[in-house]
């Protein structure tokens, strides 16, 4: 059964305005406020634009399937291996703060590859970190 999501047209419009820019798009908010849903809506929009599934990577870092990627080097290597097809790749990472040193990996991906990066995280982490 396919999941249906409540549309978030205003937030989606804001993300779309920065699509394909060099900026890393960061979506913050309290837990369960719809950050991950917004990412899925953006992925859906990319599919509508004709972006190949091979060029879209979406990972929820709270999932145990990624437990071996909790340091920035293993995370970076995993993503690097996944962006082998030609063209721009769209990277979506939910709860990125669970990866130790994630900032280094994200910056390196941004500098070294043709990518458009979207990340989510909790307000508490981002407001108390060096990013603020």
Specify the residue positions occupied by each region the protein language model found:
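Phosphate-binding site recognition
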Residues: 1-132
């Amino acid at each position: 059964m396919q999941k249906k999501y409540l549309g978030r047209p205003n937030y989606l419009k804001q993300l779309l305005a920065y699509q394909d820019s060099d900026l890393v798009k960061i979506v913050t908010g309290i837990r369960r406020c719809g950050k991950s849903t917004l990412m899925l809506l953006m992925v859906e929009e990319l599919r509508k634009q004709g972006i190949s599934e091979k060029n879209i990577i979406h990972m929820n870092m709270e999932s145990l399937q990624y437990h071996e990627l909790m340091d920035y080097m293993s995370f970076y290597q995993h993503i690097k291996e996944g962006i082998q097809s030609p063209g721009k790749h769209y990277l979506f990472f939910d709860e990125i703060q669970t990866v130790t040193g994630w900032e280094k990996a994200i910056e390196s991906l941004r500098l070294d590859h043709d990518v458009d990066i979207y990340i989510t995280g909790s307000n508490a982490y981002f407001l108390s970190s060096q990013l603020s």
